[in-house]
From Swiss-Prot:
MF terms (GO), sorted A to Z: chitin binding; chitinase activity
Cellular component, GO, one term: lysosome
Residues listed as glycosylation sites in the UniProt record: 131, 177, 212, 246, 283
Domain GH18: start-end pairs: 23-366
Transmembrane segments: none
Swiss-Prot/TrEMBL keywords: Glycoprotein, Glycosidase, Hydrolase, Lysosome, Signal
Domain of life per record: Eukaryota
Function: Involved in the degradation of asparagine-linked glycoproteins. Hydrolyze of N-acetyl-beta-D-glucosamine (1-4)N-acetylglucosamine chitobiose core from the reducing end of the bond, it requires prior cleavage by glycosylasparaginase.
Compartment list: Lysosome
Source taxonomy: Eukaryota, Metazoa, Chordata, Craniata, Vertebrata
GO BP field: chitin catabolic process; oligosaccharide catabolic process
Organism: Mus musculus
Signal peptide positions (record): 1-22
Family according to the record: Belongs to the glycosyl hydrolase 18 family.
Protein name (database record): Di-N-acetylchitobiase
Gene of this entry: Ctbs
């Protein structure tokens, strides 16, 4: 339909009408359906994977919620009432984004979805292999740049972020233009976990996010010319449970060789365990919680009903506080976690204390 015959006033109203036509505001107040415009000095970036545990989160800290579960309008309304953004998940096959027309269509769909759901941006979570000399290398950077331009043009105050591995050194065969992507979006969420996804040395259980190894990743990003203010540290609220082929007297747990993207061993030999499960298991374990000084991380050993020894590595308030201190001391943009649903939000007194301590660990110690 041609627009040339419409009065100028009507043309000015079109963006508003388009937003309203996406559906009436589900919040108690229409103002809560407006995008968040405030840019906090410090980000606390929370991944939520669904259900209603968000009602018990520490909203005094949260600045952004990446909604990776089913869309929940109640969450959006509540987050906005607390001044926090709620952003979409963005995932797409890299083979498709080589085509500029396909990119434009995908971006337009995401913008429309964000508008319809009164959301504040998008978190692009790709995590796919990219060869440095492939067309996907440049196309990925273009995708981020074009996504940022579209969202910021269409939704005032919107935020576009991109998830990267714990190190820029081609982890899991991901060769990305990190400096170009950082320049093209608001900030990078650095996934400082799953750091045993490629084990090149001994095939043994180790920390999900060893302290020194984690910090080396940030040093390498900054050496590339990426500003610390473009980096948000992601910490794990889960651990890995490994079956030990052999458990030595020194607590060395030899694990099954499971190759991953070229590496002979990986954390795929274990399985992920949320913090709430770990807390219920650790005190009844064979060893109780132990602290590894080299990796600055806790672990414990237990025996399953079949008589096999397991070793569980995880992060707790002690290990997370160390990393949060680095965030503060080196001026990073903020901190966040995968994922907020991993804690126990029940009415149990001990669980409540443990959950409060994990949220509290995100606050950098001065």
């Amino acid at each position: 339909m041609a627009l040339c015959g419409l009065p100028e006033f009507t043309l000015l109203l079109l963006p508003l009408l388009a937003r309203l036509s996406a559906g009436d505001c589900p919040c108690s107040e229409a103002a809560l359906c407006q995008p968040i415009r405030h840019r906090p000095d410090f980000e606390v970036f929370v991944f939520d994977v669904g259900q209603k545990t968000w009602k018990s989160y520490d909203w005094s800290q949260i600045t952004t919620v990446a909604a990776f579960g089913k869309y929940d309008p109640e969450l959006m309304c509540y987050a906005h009432s607390k001044g926090a953004r709620v952003v979409l998940k963005g995932d797409i096959s890299l083979k498709n984004i080589i085509d500029p027309t396909f990119r434009a269509s995908w971006i337009a769909q995401k913008v429309d979805l964000a508008k319809a759901q009164y959301m504040d941006g998008i978190n692009i979570d790709i995590e796919q292999e990219v060869n440095c000399s492939s067309p996907e290398y440049e196309a990925l950077t273009a995708l981020v740049k074009e996504t940022t331009e579209s969202f910021q043009r269409e939704i005032e105050g919107s935020q576009v972020t991109f998830d990267v591995a714990w190190s820029p050194k081609r982890i899991d065969k991901r060769c990305y233009n990190y400096t170009g992507i950082a320049d093209a979006c608001d900030f990078l969420f650095v996934m400082s976990y799953d750091e045993q996804s490629q084990i090149w040395s001994e095939c043994i259980a180790a920390a999900n996010a060893p302290y020194n190894q984690t910090l080396t990743g940030y040093i390498d990003y900054i050496k590339m010319g990426i500003s610390p203010k473009k980096l948000v540290m992601g910490v794990p609220w889960y651990g890995y449970d490994y079956i030990c082929l052999n458990l030595s007297k020194d607590d060395i747990c030899t694990i099954t060789k499971v190759p991953f993207r070229g590496a002979p061993c990986s954390d795929a030999a274990g399985h992920q365990v949320p913090y709430k499960v770990i807390m219920k298991q650790v005190n009844g374990s064979v060893s109780g919680s132990q602290w590894n000084k080299d990796q600055q991380a806790p672990y414990y050993n237990y025996k399953d009903p079949a008589g096999r020894f397991h070793q569980v590595w995880y992060d707790n308030p002690q290990s997370i506080s160390l990393k949060a201190a680095y965030v503060k001391n080196y001026g990073l943009r903020g901190i966040g976690m995968w994922n907020a649903n991993c804690l126990d939000y029940s009415d149990d007194a001990l669980a409540r204390e443990q959950t409060q301590e994990m949220w509290g660990a995100l606050k950098p110690r001065l």
